[in-house]
Amino acid sequence: MKRHIVALAFSFLFATSALSAQTFEEYMVMMDSLSMEPPQIQTDFHRKYKVKNLDYGMTIGIERTPGGRIWNCFVAGGDNEDAYFVLNWSDDNGKTWTDSKYVIDPHDKSLPFARRTIVGQLWTDPLGRLWLFYDQSVTYYYGSSTNWYSICENPDDENPVWSEPKFLGIGCTLNKPTVMSTGEWVLPVSIWDRNTMAYTVLKDVWTDEEFRASKAELDPVRGAHVYVSMDQGKSWTDRGMTRFPHPTFDEHIIIELGDGRWWMTGRVGIGTRNSGIIQSFSSDKGYTWSEPEIYQPHISSRHFITRLASGNLVMVRHGRFDECTKTRTNLTAFISDDDGKTWKGGLLLDDTYDISYPTGFQAPDGYIYVSYDLQRTRRGEIYLVKMTEEDILAGKIVSPEGFLKHLIYKPGKVEKSKANIAYRKANKKNKVK
């Protein structure tokens, strides 16, 4: 009820006066209030959320539960202010997938601005509970976003139940927490830089000066944060942070090294300009961090690193570990047995153009599952890889159940999307020229 009262109040406000008549301070109050309304996980939703009716696809997170179910979370709507989350699952090790099971769509036509959910992750904790982290912001990004989580205690049941969303703090979480040898749970949280703000959406209602001043109070803390829980997720504390040069969404991952240090890797740059996988180290459990430095050349895009049961690390990235591909292609997996100093093997997962955002997990039987998306606007497909360390070291699938390029999601109306139509028109125009 409170949510509807707020929505009606904003609707009335904007129905009685133009957007341009509102003050900068009033915009901030409205946007902050809209971002703080808890985004609900919906189980009873309109048929437009069925896979056959979706028109976009971007992978977010994938995770296995104690009973063997694999959950998938992806973005529908677009990589913009139209974004929302859809979840489904597989009960046969990723071979077949259900239709949409849950939706997080905070959009409301009665609101003066679009409100989206676009960043998050799935994670099974040591207690067997499935977590869903997800953010919320107004427009694409107005300089701030709120970070939330819900927990499912029965993720393998026919009708899993999610807890009410709980506010975590300002920012967003794209990659999984890490459980340290000390028992600490360590969660990466990013407060995006100002260069991601939706000026194209807000330029008609804010002056340049106001835009530059928006959410200025967050400027000193924009960057890659480390949240820590000492009580198995009951509470979280922002322990420390670092700021990357040329930041682009941060997208950081935190690994505990054999010598006890914490190793953070992240994303920087735009395209191939100032880009790479960046790294920073903490010797005091995340309170302070070394000056960030480039770890490996890499196109500006998400990478994936996690610790395996063997003690080795697996990394999935674009191209060889010593190259920066010109486009998002050649997703390749490597193994390190010396905490990331060197990498071995090299299993090419996919050499298609415009593939991105690998994320994954290791199952108890040793198989490593990684999902990624393909041409989000034009095809919107999500693929799954199942492999072992031996496959990666051999450079080919040698395990009996391993596979590459297995399609797990294809939106039914991607060709009719606004973005796809615009792309085809632009492509046709360029060919004419």
Regions found by a protein language model. Give the residues of each.
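Bacterial N-terminal signal peptides that target proteins for export
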Residues: 1-7
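Asp-box/BNR beta-propeller blade signature and adjacent active/binding-site loops
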Residues: 22-433
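Bacterial N-terminal signal peptides
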Residues: 7-17
